[in-house]
Each structure stands twice: as structure tokens, then as C-alpha cells.
């Protein structure tokens, strides 16, 4: 999985803010707020080839069975793709 270039991430307590930077600010004027778990998924997306590998990373981090969170991880990935910050 690959993050789209032109964004910076700022962590504020238990949420992540994804902000456009550089030229991206001319195209996008939206700040994307992510929960702690969605932020973890976004920050670690490039370590995974697919949703299944990403689910495994989340499962290890939060000590949850992968089968319990697969659908949730898939939904977060789809949302990040629709927002244009993840391929």
C-alpha cells in the first residue's frame, strides 16, 4: 500500500490530523482527522502489501485477533482511498 505524497501528519493526543502541504495545499483545502486506530493504519500502510498484512500489523499492535478486525481495517483503507491520501 502507498500513501499519496503531499501530506503531513500531526498527532494531537488520541487523534491524527492529515494536512496537505506544499503544492497539495492548492488542490486540497481539507484537514482529515483520524482516530488513533485509523491513524495507526495510515502511518503503517506502507509496511503492508495488502489489507491482510495491514490487519496483521493492527492485530499485533492492539492484541486483537485479525479475524475480528479485518472488516474494520478494510473500511478504514477504503475511506482513506476515497479521501485521496492512500492508494
Task: Give the label of every model feature segment.
Residues 1-43:
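Acidic, low-complexity/disordered tracts enriched in E/D and polar residues
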Residues 30-87:
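Long, charge-rich, low-complexity alpha-helical segments
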